[in-house]
């Protein structure tokens, strides 16, 4: 089963897409250059299964709505576990997967499937984790008592 006719090239990427930034837009633009129909698999909360990941700040529905408003994205499907992601991949039957170049040489869900992988550049320097860390740092610097419930240090 495919979501579009068989004469279209279907591409996809997956992630939680919290705090949408220009780096994501560059990725989506690049993805659309390699496929006719671009699908985003939106993960609910990666922190539930990987403690190294932050819990999303933006609620799921708002992330979904934001992604659906981007002209390069044709469809968004929601998943939580890597098993659910594999099931979505088997249902959609994509031709192309879009991954950041930071995945070069690393294993990832579905890396054993016969799907072409296009690696996109991360040279733009944007990162949700870096943005969250910067916001935290600036908040603490500008409000030094925030962690002490307002008591002077």
Predicted features along the sequence, with ranges:
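Nucleotidyltransferase catalytic core that binds NTPs
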Residues: 1-153
């Amino acid at each position: 089963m495919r979501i579009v006719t068989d004469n279209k090239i279907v591409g996809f990427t997956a992630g939680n897409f919290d705090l949408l930034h220009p780096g994501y837009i560059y990725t989506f633009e690049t993805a659309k250059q390699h496929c006719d129909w671009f699908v985003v698999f939106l993960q609910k909360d990666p922190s539930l299964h990987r403690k190294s990941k932050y819990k999303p700040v933006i609620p799921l529905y708002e992330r979904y709505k934001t992604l659906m408003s981007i002209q390069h994205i044709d469809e968004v499907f929601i998943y939580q576990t890597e098993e659910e992601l594999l099931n979505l991949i088997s249902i959609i039957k994509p031709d192309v997967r879009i991954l950041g170049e930071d995945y070069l040489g690393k294993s990832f869900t579905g890396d054993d499937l016969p799907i072409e992988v296009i690696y996109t550049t991360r040279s733009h320097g944007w990162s949700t984790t870096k943005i969250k860390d910067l916001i935290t740092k600036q908040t603490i610097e500008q409000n030094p008592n925030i962690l002490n419930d307002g008591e002077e240090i």
